[in-house]
Every structure is written in structure tokens, then in C-alpha cells.
Amino acid sequence: MLKKQDAIVLKSIDYGETNKIVTLFTKEDGKLAVLAKGAKKPNSRFAAVTQPFVYGSYLYFQGNGLPSLSQGEAVDSFKELQFDIVKSAYAAYITELVDKLTEERKPTFFLFDWLLLALRQINTGQDAEIIARIMDMKMLPLAGAKPELDCCACCRSETRDPVAFSVAYAGFLCSNCIHKDERAFPITLPFAKLFRVLYYVDLTKVGTISVKAETKRRLEWMIRTYYDEYVGVQLKARRFISQLDKMGGLSSDVDK
């Protein structure tokens, strides 16, 4: 049976001498792997459409085994993501996160839209690190690790402002409860508001978000600690971003 779907390439791995197994993320069927025969050949008609991050239309044959790619046409190749090392690193981070936290053949319609929007935002010059943090936050409910950001995670008070973020309590703590977690991250009210924005923001309405480098480092550390505790995924792209940072490859990401 032939099936045609719009999809985003999450990853592509070599298979044999000339073939690739391509993981597509589709709106209708979720994540699925297809065999692209001859895709490793330089003149292959599949060479361009099986590159990571490509958004395209794919026709594949679904038999009893691994689906076989019959045709592909790129809708958007996101050229900036292919040639800018920083943008590419964060795009890889986001696609790897989606790959790790989704199961095959389980569609999540809004996640397809989120991923496509995130790649477009990075490609057009939005702050790639902030887009990555937004996706970090939005993936938490899908991972079964939704944080409590609307009240104190301990006493449930909605009237006292948050003064800390607790990994142990999975959310904000108020001034009456901060002593209950000595490892909680102290935060300011503006930081708490930013944290909420990253969680609730509509990606279609993300404009130019200006965040200081120090604040971004703190966001990354808090979210990574939370992920390590409740989600437990290890991302190769995260390690690559850390290496880039150490080598000064993220030096364009300065305080604004």
C-alpha cells in the first residue's frame, strides 16, 4: 500500500553500502522509520530529502516490514540549519528530544506543529537557545513530568509569589515553603514569569525574545537538572552544544 504524508526528518542513518534508514515525524502517523534505497549515492533522488531537519512530502510503500521510500519532495530544506553550526546544533537538540520522547506510530498532532514552528523560528534567526528551552518545557507533559508553575508545589498557595524552583517538589515554592528543600533554586519574580512564559507561550506568537546570557545559563541548568531527575534522556546534541560553548562556538550568544 502506498501512502503519502508530510513529514520532518528527525534523523538519517546509513544502512548497508548505499541505503539509509530515515526516521520521519509525521502529523498523521507520528514517528516512523522508512528505508531509502540508494540514498547514500551522491546522485540519488533521495539524497536531499533525507537530510536532517528537511520538511517535505514523502510517498512510501507500506508492506509487512520496514516501509520503503518511493518518492520525496522537499517543502522547506531550512538551509540556515544546514550551514550554521549553532543553529544546526540546536535544531539537532530539538529533533533528538522529540525522537527520544515519542513512540513509533503514535501521532501527536500539536507536536508536529510545534516542531515545524521551532525549526522555522531558528532558521529565520530567532534565539535558538530560547527556542530550545521552550521546546524543553513543552515536552515535559508528554514525558509525564509536568511542573507546577501556577501555585506553590508544596502548600498549593496561589497568593504568595514564587521565590524558588524545587526539583524535589516539581515546581515553584513560596516563601513559607522554601526551607523544605535546601537544594531549591532561588529565583526572582521576573525569572518566575519568564519560566512561565517559556512553558505557556504559543510558538506561533513568539517574537524576538531578548534574554541575557546569564539568565539563559541558569534556565538551562535548572531545566537540565529537572530532566535528569524526572525524564532521564541523554542527548548527544546537548553534549555537542556544551563542547561548542567551551570552544567559544556560541560566542555570538551575548548579553543583550
From Swiss-Prot:
Presence of keyword Cell membrane: no
Pfam families: RecO_C, RecO_N
Listed InterPro entries: ARFGAP/RecO, DNA_rep/recomb_RecO_N, NA-bd_OB-fold, RecO, RecO_C
GO biological process entries: DNA recombination; double-strand break repair
GO CC term, one of those recorded: bacterial nucleoid
Keyword DNA damage appears in the UniProt entry: yes
Keywords on record: DNA damage, DNA recombination, DNA repair
Listed PANTHER family: DNA REPAIR PROTEIN RECO (PTHR33991:SF1)
Family of the protein in this entry: Belongs to the RecO family.
Listed HAMAP family: RecO (MF_00201)
Function statement: Involved in DNA repair and RecF pathway recombination.
Cross-referenced NCBIfam families: reco
Listed name of the protein: DNA repair protein RecO
Species of the source: Shouchella clausii (strain KSM-K16) (Alkalihalobacillus clausii)
Gene name in the database record: recO
